[in-house]
């Protein structure tokens, strides 16, 4: 039912076209770019629902206030405190290794502003946990493309 609803909204109502070439692994990192708007989260979640996959995401902790916090957590959100220099990469590696399923979407720019210098956390998480990276590129005339990169 969820897949049908997400498919209807994503493909029919919003008019997106997709090309999915990545197998459905039990564990992976999605590197999604470019991140240009707050709508990216919802479009990405609709896309994943439409193809029958689930994924978590990391988001600035400032967004996890009432009533959005419980909703974002329910959607798979992980709050990130960017002001503290904690080893988020090490934490994500530990979670990935101890989980039977681990699907995490990361926007490598780290912000919605144009940033040609991507943050490398997604790569280090994938490398440390031995996960494939799925590259997801969007926003070319309502088209999304996905492919897999093995490290």
Give each language-model segment a name.
Residues 1-19:
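Extreme N-terminal tail/first-helix region
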Residues 17-19, 133-136:
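A short linear hydrophobic-aromatic micro-motif
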